Amino acid sequence: MSNGIVIIGSGFAARQLVKNIRKQDATIPLTLIAADSMDEYNKPDLSHVISQGQRADDLTRQTAGEFAEQFNLHLFPQTWVTDIDAEARVVKSQNNQWQYDKLVLATGASAFVPPVPGRELMLTLNSQQEYRACETQLRDARRVLIVGGGLIGSELAMDFCRAGKAVTLIDNAASILASLMPPEVSSRLQHRLTEMGVHLLLKSQLQGLEKTDSGILATLDRQRSIEVDAVIAATGLRPETALARRAGLTINRGVCVDSYLQTSNADIYALGDCAEINGQVLPFLQPIQLSAMVLAKNLLGNNTPLKLPAMLVKIKTPELPLHLAGETQRQDLRWQINTERQGMVARGVDDADQLRAFVVSEDRMKEAFGLLKTLPM
């Protein structure tokens, strides 16, 4: 018997897809298989759990059972998919197998842990499950080292600092958020973190970790070291592509899909953090929401290409929040920065004075939507 549409994964992308399919078709068989509990939680909340004193279980919004009942689903939680036989259209686990008409990979991305000696001492906060495994250690830690000064690293540094912990943030780059924007734009947040007491070790490298009687000794370059109680890796995500590779699909950084979210196999699609859409990996909520709307139509036979507009990315650092959009990482833009007490507006323009990117902060974030309309599609 066919299971209709089979989805591997249960995160934000999978749930958005289920909701969009059920808006259009209440009865088509939907089967979800995932390695976790399949309980729903809001992943961005993980950046604020420590300052808000939340336990992992506090994050649960809907149990797997409630989800299955609400949307008429067949759920297989705590189930590891071991293989996909694309020719036979069968998904396999150790004890089970599922025939599919259409298969969707929504396997997400895993936290990258730098390959240094003692890397097993590093914690990651990429899921409710990961937080559950280390919440006691993080709650009890007085001194925390965050490895990586990107979006998640900056959010976590502020959160741990707000919780009264001694926070050190280390990054190879000369400024925070270096892969997202130039230093003259990120400097406002960088100064705020420093004012709050975050110890920034920029242009610095972690070389190894070692357990000691009183904590963890982190060895750095230039013969430096620091002792802490917990180390968190915030060095980016890697799309989960192992299953797709075993199915013989085309892989680059993520699972390669076209504008219809279709992989190199006509009956297999990919969505969310694991997908590379026409060469782009977009691990943000808005592109996932739009992709799920389009994919639901395509799975139900209404072929619709994905057209992504200019979209906002939000950096959730409550003491100095930022919104950004456009090609903020472009090296050839000229930045026009207007800073006032209530916030900043930074406009990145090209040689023709065309707005290509912007970053806004604090009370001036309300200007984001007007700027968004002037960005080229």
UniProtKB/Swiss-Prot annotation:
Q: Which reaction does it catalyse?
A: 2 reduced [nitric oxide reductase rubredoxin domain] + NAD(+) + H(+) = 2 oxidized [nitric oxide reductase rubredoxin domain] + NADH
Q: What keywords tag this UniProt record?
A: Cytoplasm, FAD, Flavoprotein, NAD, Oxidoreductase
Q: Where does it localize?
A: Cytoplasm
Chief localization class? cytoplasm
Pathway, per UniProt?
Nitrogen metabolism; nitric oxide reduction
* Statement: the UniProt record of this protein carries the keyword NAD: yes
Q: Which HAMAP family match?
A: NorW
Q: Which PANTHER family match?
A: NITRITE REDUCTASE [NAD(P)H] (PTHR43429:SF3), PYRIDINE NUCLEOTIDE-DISULFIDE OXIDOREDUCTASE DOMAIN-CONTAINING (PTHR43429)
Q: Which family does it belong to?
A: Belongs to the FAD-dependent oxidoreductase family.
Q: What is this protein called?
A: Nitric oxide reductase FlRd-NAD(+) reductase
**Source organism per UniProt:** Escherichia coli (strain 55989 / EAEC)
